[in-house]
Amino acid sequence: MSTATSAVTVLGAGSYGTALAICLARNGHQVTLWGRNSDDVATLAAERKNQRYLPDIPFPDTLTLEADLQRAAASNEIVLVVVPSHAFGDTLKQIKPALQQGAKVAWATKGLEPNTGRLLQEVAVQELGDAIPLAVLSGPTFAKEMAMGSPTAISVSSTSTEFAQQLADLLHCGRSFRVYNNDDFIGIQLGGAVKNVIAIGAGISDGVGFGANARTALITRGLAELTRLGCALGAKPETFMGMAGLGDLILTCTDNQSRNRRFGLALGKGESVEAAIESIGQVVEGFRNTKEVYLLAQRSGVEMPITEQIYKVLYENKDMKEAAMALLGREQRSE
């Protein structure tokens, strides 16, 4: 942890945004946490904890709540956006007039732009311009464990090496939180989106009862799909062997804390898409991500058979066992 204290605004008071705000405040930094619903924000401020998502973890004294988006964005030079991917562009559009001179914007949102499949970096440049330093945080992190202070490691990448190091210093804690700098801005973003899709597939596989062999094959070939797409877009293949690639993929595909995996499990056990989403009770990024990753792969001319079959299950009502047979029945080829 850096000995210097800073001030940071976190936009998004869901489980992950709250957890990041707690980690930053626990490191001694002044943190402003914004939430979309003013009544919910008032409750958070009164109870000094997020009873819905992280009920056993009190807020540090240096964490304050704010219900006004522009006021939150204007309050600190560093702004960390942790909203769902479908709200990302609109959130940036709203905060742009309020940002301080010299502001820096990072995000921990994992996904792609809805309906276009664009990287969030492209959305950020469109909404904020290319003069503002931008950064992304990604890696194998469940909010509850992170907020509890369990050992955690993530990656950070930025258009500015100085900003990347600043974020690493803000979050790093020798007891529990390690941050790795990575100069592959594209790869770090992409890993956080594609792993959601593969996690749904792993959940479906387990829900249907295919077993550990099938799950492991999905994870391994899913990593190959991620790497192919990433390289086609200019990412470095070694990025996908790190925290934001293999690390996040394993975590999301194998642990039932993952909403995307639980969503897939529910589908595999016979629930409809709508019922499965409702049963999760939180945003299931992978549902939208599947369509966006599929569009991006088609636009890039990259073969992603697992993603294609999951897309057909979710959006074309394809039978899950038929989708599995379509993968197994593909032409034999070298690994």
Swiss-Prot record:
InterPro entries for the chain: 6-PGluconate_DH-like_C_sf, 6PGD_dom2, G3P_DH_NAD-dep, G3P_DH_NAD-dep_C, G3P_DH_NAD-dep_N, NAD(P)-bd_dom_sf
GO cellular component, one term: cytosol
Subcellular location(s) per record: Cytoplasm
Positions of NADPH binding: S15, Y16, R36, K110, A143, R259, V283, E285
EC number: 1.1.1.94
Binding-site list for sn-glycerol 3-phosphate: K110, G139, T141, K195, D248, S258, R259, N260
Keyword ATP-binding: no
Reactions catalysed according to its record: sn-glycerol 3-phosphate + NAD(+) = dihydroxyacetone phosphate + NADH + H(+); sn-glycerol 3-phosphate + NADP(+) = dihydroxyacetone phosphate + NADPH + H(+)
Protein's UniProt name: Glycerol-3-phosphate dehydrogenase [NAD(P)+]
Protein species of origin: Pseudoalteromonas translucida (strain TAC 125)
